[in-house]
Amino acid sequence: MRAAESGADARVRPVDRVEPADAPAGDAGGLRAAVPGDGGSAVRPGDARLDVLVPPGLVDEPAAGALPGGGQRAPGAGRADGGDVRPVGGRDADGAPRFDQPVPPGGYLWWYVDAVSDDGRHGLTFIAFVGSVFSPYYAWAGGPKADRADPENHCALNIALYGDAGKRWTMTERGRRWMRRSRDEFVIGPSRLHWDGESLLVEFDEVGVPIPRRVKGRVRVWPKALCRFVTSLDSGGRHRWGPIAPCSRIEVELDSPRVRWSGHAYLDSNEGDEPIDRPFREWDWSRATMADSSTAVIYDVRQKRDGDRVIAERFLLDGSTESFEAPPRQPLPTTLWRIGRTMRTEPGVPALVEQTLEDTPFYARSMVRSGLLGEVVTSVHETMLLPRVITLPVRLMLPWRMPRRA
């Protein structure tokens, strides 16, 4: 976002859109102020357009009012057929974050925030997990198929700070007795996420590893609009993603390291009914803030057995969305851990890695310059290589970065 709107002036507007169900086929430089937003889009195998898939029964029904055929819906919970409605996408019916959504054994649900300061000198990401998908403890607890473990016994808040104040990273997994979830709040040990009806507050007091440096403070995310866009990432509809507040402002107050800043932010959620490595081989995801302060997202998913699924969506400031055709893939330089990244960019605008923020055996986060929708943009970009997550060497390394407090 480039306008410096004050969070107090934000007015949250829910957008009542969930994609319909259908059966699909088959490094240099610092942080840039022009960092992306994020969204979701039409799903395509390769580049052919497909309707987005949301599994039946997972979508919240409309509020009280007229029903097809002339009937009326009474206020309150439940479907027209008398059944229960399961929350989907880590959000409530109005699009606001909802933290008490059920998660099946072996499954996961996470809320993701990234942000960059207006001056481009600072950045951060937060990921709050129910069912810590990359955790070796969660996988080992789930038995031979890693699908029997209790997700609420494996929760974590991942914090990554970048920029002038130095780089810090924490991700301590905590057991059920350290966790509490309600509709508006998610508590993980000494940290919590809280939705107050207008903004998302994240308060945290964590310690990094292997160097034990404290990360303490609070941030507040002010959505410009709430979005109910949810789409499936896999052909079976067991893994879903959607932005909650793709165009937001953020206020950051850190006690350790001591720094204050404000900027533009993005909030989304991912969820799955099974371990994340089941259907996917890899994905590249990117979000960019456009010249009009809208957010464009490309989710480029490669499945193990079915075709590619490409989601390309532009999220406008009023909460509405516009699908677009993703430009061609371009290979990026491999990381130190030999992850082969790609970026979608328009012909004539070579993709350029401006900075690699995270370089791990299975995941890379970068700032990438590319051409998108007729503009030159800098995106927050990630590459995930799922087969590496389940290898024994990686699982034996992860406890050094992800300790557990049961």
From Swiss-Prot:
For the region Disordered, give the residue spans: 1-48, 61-101
Mark out the compositionally biased spans (Basic and acidic residues). Answer: 8-20, 81-97
Q: What is its EC number?
A: 4.2.1.131
Please give the function described in this protein's UniProt entry: Involved in the biosynthesis of carotenoids spheroidene and spirilloxanthin. Catalyzes the hydration of neurosporene to the corresponding hydroxylated carotenoids 1-HO-neurosporene and 1,1'-(HO)2-neurosporene and that of lycopene to 1-HO-lycopene and 1,1'-(HO)2-lycopene. Can also act on demethylspheroidene, spheroidene, 1-HO-3,4-didehydrolycopene and geranylgeraniol.
Gene Ontology cellular-component annotations: plasma membrane
The enzyme's main class, written as a single word, is: lyase
What this protein catalyses is: rhodopin = all-trans-lycopene + H2O; 1,1'-dihydroxy-1,1',2,2'-tetrahydrolycopene = rhodopin + H2O; 1-hydroxy-all-trans-1,2-dihydro-neurosporene = all-trans-neurosporene + H2O; 1,1'-dihydroxy-1,1',2,2'-tetrahydroneurosporene = 1-hydroxy-all-trans-1,2-dihydro-neurosporene + H2O
Please name the pathway: Carotenoid biosynthesis; spheroidene biosynthesis
Where is the sequence biased in composition, kind Low complexity? 21-34
Activity-pH behavior: Optimum pH is 8. No activity is detected at pH 4.0-5.0. At higher pH values, it shows rapid decrease in activity, although 50% of the relative activity is still detected at pH 9.0. It retains much residual activity after 30 minutes incubation at pH 4.0-8.0, indicating that CrtC is stable in both slightly alkaline and acid environments.
Q: An example of a Gene Ontology BP annotation on this entry?
A: chlorophyll biosynthetic process
Q: How does activity depend on temperature?
A: Optimum temperature is 30 degrees Celsius. Enzyme activity is significantly lower at 20 degrees Celsius and 40 degrees Celsius.
Q: Which organism is it from?
A: Rubrivivax gelatinosus
What family is reported?
Belongs to the CrtC hydratase family.
One annotated GO molecular function is: hydro-lyase activity
- The gene is crtC
Enumerate the CDD domains for this protein. CrtC-like
Protein name (Swiss-Prot/TrEMBL): Acyclic carotenoid 1,2-hydratase
Kindly state which keywords UniProt assigns to this record, in alphabetical order: Carotenoid biosynthesis, Cell membrane, Chlorophyll biosynthesis, Lyase, Membrane, Photosynthesis
Main localization category: membrane
Cellular localization per UniProt: Cell membrane
